[in-house]
Curated annotation (Swiss-Prot):
Cofactor: how bound: Binds 1 zinc ion per subunit.
Pfam families: RsgA_GTPase (PF03193)
Functional summary from the UniProt entry: One of several proteins that assist in the late maturation steps of the functional core of the 30S ribosomal subunit. Helps release RbfA from mature subunits. May play a role in the assembly of ribosomal proteins into the subunit. Circularly permuted GTPase that catalyzes slow GTP hydrolysis, GTPase activity is stimulated by the 30S ribosomal subunit.
Domain CP-type G: 103-271
Protein name according to UniProt: Small ribosomal subunit biogenesis GTPase RsgA
Gene: rsgA
Length: 346
Protein backbone atom coordinates (compact mmCIF):
# COMPACT_ATOMS: atom_id res chain seq x y z
CA UNK A 1 0.00 0.00 0.00
CA UNK A 2 1.41 3.37 -1.06
CA UNK A 3 2.29 5.77 1.72
CA UNK A 4 -0.14 8.69 1.90
CA UNK A 5 1.52 11.98 1.03
CA UNK A 6 1.21 14.67 3.68
CA UNK A 7 -0.30 18.00 2.76
CA UNK A 8 1.76 21.16 3.12
CA UNK A 9 -0.28 22.20 6.17
CA UNK A 10 0.25 18.81 7.84
CA UNK A 11 3.99 19.01 7.20
CA UNK A 12 4.16 22.49 8.75
CA UNK A 13 2.25 21.35 11.82
CA UNK A 14 4.55 18.34 12.32
CA UNK A 15 7.64 20.55 11.98
CA UNK A 16 6.23 23.06 14.47
CA UNK A 17 5.34 20.39 17.04
CA UNK A 18 8.78 18.82 16.64
CA UNK A 19 10.49 22.17 17.21
CA UNK A 20 8.41 22.81 20.33
CA UNK A 21 9.25 19.35 21.70
CA UNK A 22 12.97 19.90 21.16
CA UNK A 23 12.74 23.31 22.82
CA UNK A 24 11.05 21.85 25.90
CA UNK A 25 13.65 19.07 26.03
CA UNK A 26 16.58 21.50 25.91
CA UNK A 27 15.12 24.03 28.32
CA UNK A 28 16.31 23.70 31.90
CA UNK A 29 13.71 25.16 34.22
CA UNK A 30 14.95 27.17 37.17
CA UNK A 31 13.16 26.00 40.28
CA UNK A 32 12.53 28.67 42.92
CA UNK A 33 11.59 27.52 46.39
CA UNK A 34 9.47 29.90 48.47
CA UNK A 35 12.28 30.76 50.87
CA UNK A 36 14.43 31.87 47.91
CA UNK A 37 11.97 34.65 47.01
CA UNK A 38 11.17 38.00 48.58
CA UNK A 39 7.81 39.69 49.13
CA UNK A 40 5.23 40.07 46.37
CA UNK A 41 5.37 43.40 44.54
CA UNK A 42 3.77 45.17 41.59
CA UNK A 43 5.42 45.49 38.19
CA UNK A 44 4.90 46.06 34.47
CA UNK A 45 6.17 43.79 31.70
CA UNK A 46 8.46 45.88 29.48
CA UNK A 47 9.92 43.09 27.32
CA UNK A 48 8.71 39.58 26.54
CA UNK A 49 10.99 36.80 25.33
CA UNK A 50 10.16 33.19 24.57
CA UNK A 51 10.50 31.85 28.13
CA UNK A 52 11.34 34.99 30.13
CA UNK A 53 10.11 38.54 30.60
CA UNK A 54 11.66 41.77 31.83
CA UNK A 55 9.62 43.37 34.61
CA UNK A 56 9.93 46.95 35.80
CA UNK A 57 9.19 47.59 39.46
CA UNK A 58 7.66 50.74 40.94
CA UNK A 59 11.15 52.25 41.39
CA UNK A 60 11.93 51.91 37.67
CA UNK A 61 14.33 48.98 38.09
CA UNK A 62 14.14 46.15 35.54
CA UNK A 63 14.52 42.46 36.39
CA UNK A 64 14.49 39.40 34.16
CA UNK A 65 11.96 36.90 35.45
CA UNK A 66 10.67 33.41 34.93
CA UNK A 67 6.94 32.77 34.49
CA UNK A 68 4.86 30.50 36.66
CA UNK A 69 3.52 27.60 34.63
CA UNK A 70 -0.02 28.55 35.63
CA UNK A 71 0.16 31.77 33.58
CA UNK A 72 -1.59 31.21 30.27
CA UNK A 73 -0.14 34.20 28.45
CA UNK A 74 1.99 37.23 29.16
CA UNK A 75 2.57 40.25 26.91
CA UNK A 76 4.24 43.65 27.02
CA UNK A 77 2.12 46.11 28.97
CA UNK A 78 0.76 43.52 31.39
CA UNK A 79 0.56 44.63 35.02
CA UNK A 80 1.82 41.78 37.16
CA UNK A 81 2.59 40.55 40.65
CA UNK A 82 6.13 39.22 40.94
CA UNK A 83 8.74 38.24 43.53
CA UNK A 84 12.42 39.01 43.44
CA UNK A 85 14.87 36.22 44.17
CA UNK A 86 17.44 36.51 46.95
CA UNK A 87 20.06 35.87 44.28
CA UNK A 88 20.26 35.48 40.51
CA UNK A 89 19.97 32.02 39.00
CA UNK A 90 21.36 31.68 35.47
CA UNK A 91 20.79 35.39 34.87
CA UNK A 92 17.18 35.31 36.12
CA UNK A 93 16.27 37.55 39.05
CA UNK A 94 12.72 36.59 40.00
CA UNK A 95 9.37 35.02 39.18
CA UNK A 96 6.13 36.45 37.80
CA UNK A 97 3.29 34.91 39.78
CA UNK A 98 0.08 36.61 38.59
CA UNK A 99 -1.31 38.93 35.92
CA UNK A 100 -3.81 41.67 36.74
CA UNK A 101 -6.96 41.79 34.57
CA UNK A 102 -6.28 43.66 31.32
CA UNK A 103 -8.08 46.87 30.41
CA UNK A 104 -7.73 45.80 26.77
CA UNK A 105 -5.45 43.88 24.46
CA UNK A 106 -4.64 43.53 20.80
CA UNK A 107 -4.12 40.10 19.30
CA UNK A 108 -3.28 38.48 16.01
CA UNK A 109 -4.34 35.06 14.74
CA UNK A 110 -1.63 32.43 14.80
CA UNK A 111 -1.90 29.45 12.47
CA UNK A 112 -0.95 26.91 15.15
CA UNK A 113 -1.81 28.57 18.46
CA UNK A 114 -5.07 30.36 17.64
CA UNK A 115 -5.53 33.96 18.76
CA UNK A 116 -2.24 35.26 20.16
CA UNK A 117 -2.13 38.45 22.33
CA UNK A 118 0.54 40.99 21.33
CA UNK A 119 0.25 43.81 23.86
CA UNK A 120 -2.05 44.90 26.68
CA UNK A 121 -3.34 48.00 28.49
CA UNK A 122 -3.01 50.36 25.52
CA UNK A 123 -4.44 53.88 25.33
CA UNK A 124 -3.80 54.57 21.66
CA UNK A 125 -2.87 52.64 18.51
CA UNK A 126 -0.63 54.61 16.14
CA UNK A 127 -1.31 53.42 12.58
CA UNK A 128 1.85 54.28 10.65
CA UNK A 129 1.62 54.44 6.87
CA UNK A 130 3.88 56.04 4.29
CA UNK A 131 3.97 57.32 0.73
CA UNK A 132 6.77 54.81 0.06
CA UNK A 133 6.32 52.10 -1.12
CA UNK A 134 2.66 53.13 -1.51
CA UNK A 135 -0.22 54.56 0.50
CA UNK A 136 -2.71 51.76 1.07
CA UNK A 137 -6.11 52.81 2.41
CA UNK A 138 -7.07 49.14 2.51
CA UNK A 139 -4.30 48.45 5.04
CA UNK A 140 -5.36 51.47 7.10
CA UNK A 141 -8.93 50.15 7.15
CA UNK A 142 -7.72 46.78 8.42
CA UNK A 143 -5.96 48.39 11.36
CA UNK A 144 -8.99 50.59 12.09
CA UNK A 145 -11.15 47.45 12.36
CA UNK A 146 -8.75 46.19 15.04
CA UNK A 147 -8.96 49.52 16.89
CA UNK A 148 -12.76 49.58 16.83
CA UNK A 149 -13.14 45.98 18.00
CA UNK A 150 -10.56 46.47 20.80
CA UNK A 151 -12.12 49.87 21.64
CA UNK A 152 -8.73 51.59 21.52
CA UNK A 153 -8.39 55.12 20.14
CA UNK A 154 -6.42 55.23 16.87
CA UNK A 155 -4.17 57.88 15.35
CA UNK A 156 -3.42 57.65 11.62
CA UNK A 157 0.14 58.82 10.96
CA UNK A 158 1.46 59.34 7.44
CA UNK A 159 5.26 59.26 7.50
CA UNK A 160 7.83 60.32 4.89
CA UNK A 161 5.76 63.29 3.67
CA UNK A 162 9.06 65.04 2.87
CA UNK A 163 9.11 62.87 -0.27
CA UNK A 164 5.93 64.52 -1.57
CA UNK A 165 5.72 67.44 -3.95
CA UNK A 166 3.02 69.97 -3.02
CA UNK A 167 0.64 68.62 -5.66
CA UNK A 168 1.17 65.05 -4.45
CA UNK A 169 0.65 66.14 -0.86
CA UNK A 170 -2.70 67.69 -1.68
CA UNK A 171 -3.75 64.48 -3.41
CA UNK A 172 -2.81 62.43 -0.33
CA UNK A 173 -4.66 64.84 1.98
CA UNK A 174 -7.76 64.48 -0.20
CA UNK A 175 -7.54 60.67 0.09
CA UNK A 176 -7.21 60.82 3.88
CA UNK A 177 -10.14 63.21 4.28
CA UNK A 178 -12.55 60.25 4.32
CA UNK A 179 -11.12 59.37 7.74
CA UNK A 180 -11.28 62.89 9.14
CA UNK A 181 -14.92 63.08 8.06
CA UNK A 182 -15.81 60.19 10.38
CA UNK A 183 -13.81 61.44 13.35
CA UNK A 184 -10.38 59.85 12.97
CA UNK A 185 -7.32 61.94 13.75
CA UNK A 186 -4.69 62.33 11.01
CA UNK A 187 -1.09 63.50 11.40
CA UNK A 188 1.28 63.98 8.45
CA UNK A 189 4.88 63.78 9.62
CA UNK A 190 8.47 63.23 8.57
CA UNK A 191 11.01 61.55 10.82
CA UNK A 192 13.69 62.87 8.45
CA UNK A 193 12.73 66.57 8.39
CA UNK A 194 11.07 66.62 11.81
CA UNK A 195 7.76 67.92 10.47
CA UNK A 196 5.00 67.59 13.10
CA UNK A 197 7.19 65.38 15.30
CA UNK A 198 6.53 67.67 18.28
CA UNK A 199 2.79 67.12 17.81
CA UNK A 200 3.35 63.36 17.72
CA UNK A 201 5.43 63.34 20.91
CA UNK A 202 2.78 65.47 22.64
CA UNK A 203 0.11 62.92 21.71
CA UNK A 204 2.32 60.03 22.85
CA UNK A 205 2.69 61.70 26.26
CA UNK A 206 -1.01 61.08 26.95
CA UNK A 207 -0.67 57.39 27.81
CA UNK A 208 0.62 54.08 26.44
CA UNK A 209 0.70 53.77 22.66
CA UNK A 210 1.73 51.07 20.20
CA UNK A 211 2.97 51.52 16.64
CA UNK A 212 1.39 49.31 13.98
CA UNK A 213 2.08 49.24 10.27
CA UNK A 214 3.81 47.31 7.53
CA UNK A 215 7.59 47.11 7.42
CA UNK A 216 9.18 49.92 5.47
CA UNK A 217 6.83 52.67 6.64
CA UNK A 218 9.41 54.06 9.06
CA UNK A 219 8.36 52.83 12.51
CA UNK A 220 11.97 52.31 13.63
CA UNK A 221 12.99 55.70 12.25
CA UNK A 222 10.22 57.31 14.26
CA UNK A 223 11.40 55.56 17.43
CA UNK A 224 14.97 56.70 16.75
CA UNK A 225 13.73 60.28 16.41
CA UNK A 226 11.61 60.13 19.57
CA UNK A 227 14.14 58.09 21.57
CA UNK A 228 17.63 58.55 20.06
CA UNK A 229 19.23 56.53 22.86
CA UNK A 230 17.25 53.43 21.89
CA UNK A 231 18.77 53.31 18.39
CA UNK A 232 16.24 50.83 17.02
CA UNK A 233 17.71 49.10 14.00
CA UNK A 234 16.41 50.65 10.77
CA UNK A 235 15.73 48.40 7.78
CA UNK A 236 15.83 49.51 4.16
CA UNK A 237 12.89 49.04 1.84
CA UNK A 238 13.48 46.05 -0.41
CA UNK A 239 13.82 47.07 -4.05
CA UNK A 240 12.20 43.85 -5.22
CA UNK A 241 9.23 43.50 -2.87
CA UNK A 242 8.81 47.11 -1.72
CA UNK A 243 8.59 45.86 1.89
CA UNK A 244 11.12 46.61 4.59
CA UNK A 245 13.06 43.94 6.43
CA UNK A 246 12.36 42.91 10.02
CA UNK A 247 14.01 45.47 12.33
CA UNK A 248 12.71 44.59 15.81
CA UNK A 249 13.17 41.17 17.41
CA UNK A 250 11.33 41.43 20.76
CA UNK A 251 8.29 43.38 21.90
CA UNK A 252 9.44 46.28 24.04
CA UNK A 253 7.89 49.07 26.11
CA UNK A 254 9.81 52.36 26.16
CA UNK A 255 9.31 55.27 28.56
CA UNK A 256 9.24 58.61 26.77
CA UNK A 257 11.13 61.65 28.16
CA UNK A 258 8.10 63.93 27.85
CA UNK A 259 5.83 61.33 29.51
CA UNK A 260 3.89 58.37 28.23
CA UNK A 261 5.01 54.96 27.00
CA UNK A 262 5.59 53.48 23.57
CA UNK A 263 5.36 49.78 22.68
CA UNK A 264 7.16 48.44 19.61
CA UNK A 265 6.39 44.88 18.58
CA UNK A 266 7.53 42.69 15.67
CA UNK A 267 4.29 40.69 15.93
CA UNK A 268 2.27 43.30 14.11
CA UNK A 269 4.00 43.34 10.74
CA UNK A 270 1.15 41.32 9.28
CA UNK A 271 -2.06 41.90 11.15
CA UNK A 272 -4.24 39.03 9.92
CA UNK A 273 -7.96 39.28 10.53
CA UNK A 274 -8.98 35.79 9.44
CA UNK A 275 -10.16 34.95 12.97
CA UNK A 276 -13.02 37.45 12.56
CA UNK A 277 -16.36 36.84 10.88
CA UNK A 278 -18.31 39.19 8.61
CA UNK A 279 -20.45 40.53 11.47
CA UNK A 280 -17.37 41.46 13.51
CA UNK A 281 -15.76 43.16 10.51
CA UNK A 282 -18.94 45.16 9.93
CA UNK A 283 -18.83 46.40 13.54
CA UNK A 284 -15.29 47.60 12.84
CA UNK A 285 -16.60 50.29 10.49
CA UNK A 286 -17.86 53.06 12.76
CA UNK A 287 -19.80 54.99 10.11
CA UNK A 288 -21.84 51.87 9.24
CA UNK A 289 -23.33 51.59 12.71
CA UNK A 290 -26.17 54.10 12.32
CA UNK A 291 -27.69 52.19 9.38
CA UNK A 292 -27.10 48.61 10.53
CA UNK A 293 -30.33 46.87 11.40
CA UNK A 294 -32.38 49.01 9.02
CA UNK A 295 -31.92 46.88 5.89
CA UNK A 296 -35.02 45.21 4.45
CA UNK A 297 -33.70 41.71 5.16
CA UNK A 298 -31.96 40.60 8.37
CA UNK A 299 -29.40 38.50 6.45
CA UNK A 300 -28.48 41.36 4.11
CA UNK A 301 -24.94 41.01 2.72
CA UNK A 302 -24.83 44.74 1.86
CA UNK A 303 -24.10 44.05 -1.80
CA UNK A 304 -26.91 43.89 -4.37
CA UNK A 305 -29.52 42.87 -1.80
CA UNK A 306 -32.83 44.70 -2.28
CA UNK A 307 -33.54 47.26 0.42
CA UNK A 308 -29.90 47.48 1.62
CA UNK A 309 -29.69 50.59 3.80
CA UNK A 310 -25.89 50.54 3.76
CA UNK A 311 -25.64 50.61 -0.03
CA UNK A 312 -28.29 53.32 -0.12
CA UNK A 313 -26.21 55.43 2.29
CA UNK A 314 -23.22 55.04 -0.05
CA UNK A 315 -25.29 56.12 -3.05
CA UNK A 316 -26.50 59.16 -1.11
CA UNK A 317 -22.92 60.17 -0.31
CA UNK A 318 -23.30 59.56 3.43
CA UNK A 319 -20.69 56.78 3.44
CA UNK A 320 -17.42 56.78 1.49
CA UNK A 321 -17.53 54.43 -1.52
CA UNK A 322 -13.80 53.80 -0.97
CA UNK A 323 -14.43 52.54 2.56
CA UNK A 324 -17.45 50.55 1.35
CA UNK A 325 -15.37 48.86 -1.38
CA UNK A 326 -12.52 48.15 1.06
CA UNK A 327 -15.05 46.60 3.44
CA UNK A 328 -16.24 44.10 0.83
CA UNK A 329 -12.68 43.45 -0.31
CA UNK A 330 -11.81 42.60 3.29
CA UNK A 331 -14.82 40.30 3.70
CA UNK A 332 -13.90 38.51 0.47
CA UNK A 333 -10.25 38.13 1.47
CA UNK A 334 -11.27 36.59 4.81
CA UNK A 335 -13.35 33.93 3.06
CA UNK A 336 -10.45 33.09 0.74
CA UNK A 337 -7.92 32.93 3.59
CA UNK A 338 -10.09 30.69 5.76
CA UNK A 339 -10.65 28.37 2.82
CA UNK A 340 -6.92 28.15 2.13
CA UNK A 341 -6.09 27.50 5.80
CA UNK A 342 -9.05 25.17 6.39
CA UNK A 343 -9.81 27.48 9.30
CA UNK A 344 -13.08 27.37 11.22
CA UNK A 345 -14.50 29.76 13.82
CA UNK A 346 -16.15 26.84 15.62
Amino acid sequence: MAKRKLTQNQTRRIQSNNAKTLHRHKKKDIEWSDEMLGESQEGVVVTRYSIHADVENEQGEIYRCNLRRTLSSLVVGDKVVWRKGNEQLQGVSGVIEAIHPRENEISRPDYYDGLKPIAANIDRIIIVSAVLPTLSLNIIDRYLVVCEIAEIKPLIVLNKVDLLAQEQRQEIEDQLKIYQDIGYEILMISAKSGENMEKLTALLAQGTAIFVGQSGVGKSSLINHILPSVNAQVGDVSETSGLGQHTTTSSRLYHLPQGGNLIDSPGIREFGLWHLDAEQITKGYREFQYVLGTCKFRDCKHLSDPGCALREAVEQGKISPVRYDNYHRLIESLSETKSQRHFSLV
